[in-house]
Amino acid sequence: MKALRKQKIETANIQVGDQMVIPLAELGEFTATAHKVTDESVMFIFDEYVTCRPMNNCSTNKGGFEKSDLKKWMDTVLFMAFPEELRDKIYGLTIPTVGQIVGHEDEWDNKNLEPDSDEQLPLMKECKNRIACFEDQLTWGWLRNATKEGFSSARFANVYYGGYA
């Protein structure tokens, strides 16, 4: 019989699929999974949404994600919610791109969303890893890509309940 066991271990070598529980000040404790590991960095993505916020306080995607109200909140409030020992190791907070979550196969995405050159993350090839909840309720979440101006000047891509962007 084969069994998959999860154990807590101390390690300096993070691998894709490793998970860690991160206490976020007044937001609660959240599990994050390592999705990409390089010699210089590790990309963790929270398994659940830590908050439910608009991308911008007004209906616009001008400036993209980098100039959004959500990014400003992440760089200030969310960043400070991390434990101090992790803040020293964080090289920037962001949200995934369409490419990282579902790849670049969808014709509609390629035609209507700002492009990215990111490859689909290995764990995201399984639909179950693209689905997330907020406060134990299945919901959708933002992706970094804004819609192109010819389609809409107010929208961003998102990943839906079924794991599709």
Give the label of every model feature segment.
Residues 1-165:
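Collagenous Gly-X-Y triple-helix signature in extracellular proteins
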